[in-house]
Amino acid sequence: MAAELDLERALVIGVASSALFDLRESDAVFREQGEERYREYQREHLDDVLEPGVAFPFIRRLLDLNDLSDRERLVEVVILSRNDPETGMRVMRSVARHGLDITRAIFMQGRAPYRFMEPLRMSLFLSANEDDVREAIDMGFAAGRVVGRAQPDDGDTDLRIAFDFDGVLADDSAERVFQSEGLDGYQESESALAEVPLSRGPMADFLEKINRIQGIEESKSLDDPSGYRRRVHVAVVTARSAPAHERAINSIGQWGLRVNDAFFLG
């Protein structure tokens, strides 16, 4: 029996094909030769497997966490694309050839599919396209741009996630104080409000879902302390320093969330 998917409980990620695969060659065809030649190119190369993109190792390691439960699907990844279904076929064939457990995709020719993030309860959207990321953020969704060149996927299973704090896990209200009142005013404000939690930011839901998976890992580790090694590690890396660090720690705890490590580097 297939594991059940509960969108309210699962960690659901939207990923653009530009983040998952290296599309530089086909994108160049689109830009330089136009849409019709691009469509022909994709048909001609339908069975040519796309090379992994920047987000590929991250997505693979997330999906691998589904082996922690036979009853429910812990992680679901959905491809969100401005391609039409025909040109998107190459993406889905490459997904299958790489052995990625991704079966859901939304292809909308030339249009942004972000409005489906909320009904699908997506905690994050990843893309290599800066404009797409900004558009998703402007619509109120958590989104991130993947940058650089893809690195070889070494097949490791460890998943290490680092979050900034202000404007990411938390809202940006403290950052606004810093901008308006300077460092001294900011430190004074954060010291006075050390026990008052900040409001949750755009990535807090993602951390909550990751924490749930970590809880399952903790149970596995307790049941098999010598045989199971935890894979997921979470850190906060922030420009905050003492005394402002206390409000960050207290906020995370009062939200009912946790991190393994914290780096206060202001």
Regions found by a protein language model. Give the residues of each.
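Phosphate-coordination loops involved in phosphoryl transfer and adenosine-cofactor binding
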Residues: 158
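Glycine-rich beta-to-alpha transition loops that act as phosphate-gripper elements at the mouths
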Residues: 128, 265-266
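Alpha-helical substrate-recognition element adjacent to the catalytic core
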Residues: 2-111, 155, 165-264
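Hydrophobic, ordered structural segments
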Residues: 20-23, 94-98, 113-152, 169, ...
